[in-house]
Amino acid sequence: MTTILKHLPVGQRIGIAFSGGLDTSAALLWMRQKGAVPYAYTANLGQPDEEDYDAIPRRAMEYGAENARLIDCRKQLVAEGIAAIQCGAFHNTTGGLTYFNTTPLGRAVTGTMLVAAMKDDGVNIWGDGSTYKGNDIERFYRYGLLTNAELQIYKPWLDTDFIDELGGRQEMSEFMVASGFDYKMSAEKAYSTDSNMLGATHEAKDLEFLNSSVKIVNPIMGVKFWDENVKVQVEEVTVRFERGHPVALNGQTFSDDVELMLEANRIGGRHGLGMSDQIENRIIEAKSRGIYEAPGMALLHIAYERLLTGIHNEDTIEQYHSHGRQLGKLLYQGRWFDPQALMLRDALQRWVASAITGEVTLELRRGNDYSILNTVSDNLTYKAERLTMEKGDSVFSPDDRIGQLTMRNLDITDTREKLFNYIETGLLSASSGNGLPQVENLEHSDKK
């Protein structure tokens, strides 16, 4: 069976991930007019820039959908977002600022839940608005086939007939008007935006040029913290975790995790927390650039890692960072539910997150400027009295440290011998100044 259909399957049911925007509206109407039977599925991901979800399925029906459904994905999305925080599943960082993989998390949830809904309706052909140059086409492909082994893929943007007729936004808008729909294109922005309740992605168009900065972006989850005319009040916030799960903000508990994430977004958003500018490697190995918002994820991540460093030992923390980066890359590639990802998730959630219980108080200022004011946990292995520089009872004595240092003589001797060996082979040169060997100029060494 052919998995990817290059041309419209006339007379067959096609499920389309319907956003209500111009692209998917024109695609749905075009498919109906050409003889297919489109079904529209809209994911409620708590997008901060969406005002009326209920209106989206109604529009789909007007444009010719056989049926239109709104699928509430918010609870599952937040669950996956918290899992990513517990595992540190983030691999793209620049200058200490993190991209929280909010779009890949959204695709994992959308790609599975919408296809599951389609399968229930007897719809086994799926289309969405992802382009062939991006990451989403592969993410949706993987998650769709994982959910429904009989799934076939039809994307209007891979169909030359569709492209020839409606290859651009102007053509799509004219097509909608000619078909009797008073569809006006939204004002053209200098970049495109995709969002869910975990975060927002701004990319493409002007942002493809590195001399266009964050300053051209209008945040949808926070404030323009770089603009001195925007007033930002210093704010203290306390975040509490129990067994790796965020449970309270400023002492307030929440009926569900969705409400907690929304409040975390509001708190972090007041400061522009979690906004970053990243150059990343797409799945196809080409580099792209994005500007990201994730105020709630950033707030929870900061508090979580503060507790992590105070509770776990050095090697566990090292494994958390190493495995977290691996897992973040798998998530980015659309492999969040693959066995290798599940193995890493299980280890990190079972042995790392389960011990993270406590409370962290932060002072938030502008953007990513913050201070940690207090850290409280019954599980802390950090004990001030163990290494206090003040006089008092100590867990070990000066004689104990002398013995420990004496044991170091073994590896110091080995290291010194190796350094002299490197001098003999020409990799290092002896120094007449400070007595330490010096690395030879590589070009000079090659000529030897």
UniProtKB/Swiss-Prot annotation:
GO cellular component: cytoplasm
Main location: cytoplasm
Cellular compartment(s): Cytoplasm
Pathway noted in the entry: Amino-acid biosynthesis; L-arginine biosynthesis; L-arginine from L-ornithine and carbamoyl phosphate: step 2/3
Reactions mediated catalytically: L-citrulline + L-aspartate + ATP = 2-(N(omega)-L-arginino)succinate + AMP + diphosphate + H(+)
Gene3D superfamilies reported for this sequence: 1.10.287.400, Argininosuccinate synthetase, chain A, domain 2, HUPs
E.C. number(s) listed in UniProt: 6.3.4.5
One Pfam entry name: Arginosuc_syn_C
Binding site for L-aspartate: T131, N135, D136
Residue sites binding L-citrulline per the record: Y99, N135, R139, S192, T201, E203, E280
Annotated residues for binding of ATP: A17, F18, S19, G20, G21, L22, D23, T24, S25, A43, G129, T131, D136, D194
GO biological process per UniProt: argininosuccinate metabolic process; L-arginine biosynthetic process; urea cycle
Gene Ontology molecular functions: argininosuccinate synthase activity; ATP binding; protein homodimerization activity
Broad EC category: ligase
Alphabetized UniProt keyword annotations: Amino-acid biosynthesis, Arginine biosynthesis, ATP-binding, Cytoplasm, Ligase, Nucleotide-binding
Subunit structure: Homotetramer.
Xref: HAMAP family: Arg_succ_synth_type2
Protein family membership: Belongs to the argininosuccinate synthase family. Type 2 subfamily.
Protein name, UniProt field: Argininosuccinate synthase
Source organism (scientific name): Enterobacter sp. (strain 638)
